[in-house]
């Protein structure tokens, strides 16, 4: 009977959580009414002043609304001015017949959208010979005018068209079949197979750059990692329904911003061990055990995952039940205290952040651990609260690792934000046809997301790369590639994204 009751309670909990996820707010922010449980400010909350406070004078004033912000956002755009004025024969005063003079102007701004346009650029290279040598029947030297090498020999692809298709798919999540339709409206008959070939060939140019970015990434001592699923239809030895994986590796708050994606057919921990071979330092991860195979690193856990489990346990409670005194709310409050401290330390130095954490965060962790150990024996292991408690206890060494260095972060949200563009794109184009296509997509995403992290315009940067990479004598020359990296000071200003 007790077992049936426990199962019923579990199913009811799962139902309430599923209902909340489907119809409720998706935010994990704590409701203001839940903040009454204050763990470490009890003395301040309960204290009463010994003496009467001096009266305070309330000063009220009206803030002037700042002006010019809308116009300032347009400063980076070209301006076309259309002037409306009276002709000379119209500048006559209706009262006295005198000549009217210009007194002032009235101005309004409008944004005009210019749809995508296409044109043919015909490259004509002239060949020269010497007339005198021709007349005197001497060996005639032939001189050919220099011409840039094409980005895709034998095709209609240009640096701009290849960059445009990549940006549409990997930044704006437009599948190739939709781009095929868009080009048709421009009067261009370009099949999605042709567009796919452009992407594959472009990824070949970008691959040495991504390899160079990986070399820089492995030199850092703090990294973040995450993984998500990807369906590849023609994976050798696997059915079309089987999930493959896209792994993410990126730098932290220090060092150059680098975001790399790596396609692998499985979720085996050997993949991050291989990719991160040679890396020594701290690795921010979630609770997946596969990262334990990475040697020579200190794993740093994610408090956002731990907090989310207590948040789900709280949301799954019956609607009429008071939540402020529940164990789920207490566990969530511990997590909120830690995040509140981190918000205060957002702009301080790593040394100061480490000192404050040891002074304020460490006591919270010690109290939380004692609370978890006490609650574990009181809670059903399979309940959402039991799972939240078990997760925190099982991950405790990783969850407390952020105390070791002030540069470390409380959560792994940095990697989750970086993997989100791929997840959004996946909802639109759903799958990759082949492993080769999946690897090409990982390469392109790596360049684009790193460029965005560096404040670059993805289209302009890709266009610049496809103009420069074919001209390199050695496309794998480290020094030449370093000048093309997203954080390089050698990049032209045209690659920069306009500041909003």
Q: What is each PLM-predicted segment?
A:
Residues 1-156, 224-225, 231, 251, ...:
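Short, flexible loop/hinge motifs at secondary-structure junctions
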């Amino acid at each position: 009977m007790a077992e049936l009751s426990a199962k019923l309670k579990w199913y009811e909990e799962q139902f309430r959580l599923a209902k909340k996820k489907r119809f409720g707010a998706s935010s994990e922010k704590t409701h203001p009414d839940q903040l009454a449980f204050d763990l470490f400010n009890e003395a301040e909350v309960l204290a009463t002043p010994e003496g009467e406070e001096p009266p305070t004078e309330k000063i009220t004033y009206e803030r002037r609304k700042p002006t010019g912000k809308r116009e300032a956002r347009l400063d980076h755009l070209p301006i076309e001015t259309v002037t409306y004025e009276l002709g000379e024969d119209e500048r006559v005063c209706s009262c006295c017949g005198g000549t009217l003079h210009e007194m002032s102007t009235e101005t309004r701004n409008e944004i005009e959208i210019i749809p995508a346009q296409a044109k043919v650029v015909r490259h004509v290279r002239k060949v020269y010979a010497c007339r005198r040598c021709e007349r005197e029947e001497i060996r005639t030297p032939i001189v050919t005018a220099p011409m840039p090498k094409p980005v895709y020999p034998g095709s209609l692809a240009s640096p701009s068209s290849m960059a445009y298709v990549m940006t549409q798919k990997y930044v704006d999540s437009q599948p190739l079949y939709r781009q095929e339709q868009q080009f048709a409206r421009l009067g261009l008959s370009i099949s999605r197979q042709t567009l796919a070939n452009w992407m594959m060939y472009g990824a070949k140019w970008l691959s040495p750059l991504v390899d160079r970015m990986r070399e820089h990434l492995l030199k850092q001592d703090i990294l973040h990692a995450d993984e998500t699923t990807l369906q590849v239809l023609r994976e050798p030895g696997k059915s079309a329904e089987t999930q493959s994986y896209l792994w993410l590796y990126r730098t932290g708050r220090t060092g150059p911003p680098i975001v790399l994606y790596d396609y692998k057919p499985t979720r085996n921990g050997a993949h991050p061990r291989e990719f991160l071979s040679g890396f020594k330092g701290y690795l921010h991860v979630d609770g997946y055990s596969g990262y334990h195979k990475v040697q020579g690193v200190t794993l740093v856990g994610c408090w956002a995952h731990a907090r989310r489990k207590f948040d789900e346990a709280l949301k799954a409670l019956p609607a009429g039940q008071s939540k402020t005194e529940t164990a789920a709310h207490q566990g969530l409050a511990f997590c909120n205290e830690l995040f509140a401290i981190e918000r205060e330390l957002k702009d301080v130095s790593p040394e100061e952040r480490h000192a404050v954490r040891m002074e304020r965060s460490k006591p919270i962790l010690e109290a939380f651990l004692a609370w978890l150990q006490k609650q574990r024996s009181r809670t059903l292991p399979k309940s959402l609260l039991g799972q939240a408690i078990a997760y925190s206890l099982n991950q405790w060494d990783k969850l407390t690792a952020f105390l070791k260095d002030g540069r470390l972060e409380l959560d792994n949200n940095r990697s989750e934000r970086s993997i989100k563009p791929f997840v959004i794109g996946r909802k639109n184009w759903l799958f990759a046809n082949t492993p080769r296509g999946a690897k090409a997509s990982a390469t392109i995403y790596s360049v684009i997301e790193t460029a965005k992290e560096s404040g670059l315009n993805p289209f302009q940067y890709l266009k610049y790369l496809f103009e420069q990479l074919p001209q390199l004598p050695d496309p794998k020359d480290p020094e030449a590639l370093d000048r093309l990296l997203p954080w390089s000071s050698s990049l032209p200003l045209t690659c920069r994204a306009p500041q909003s």
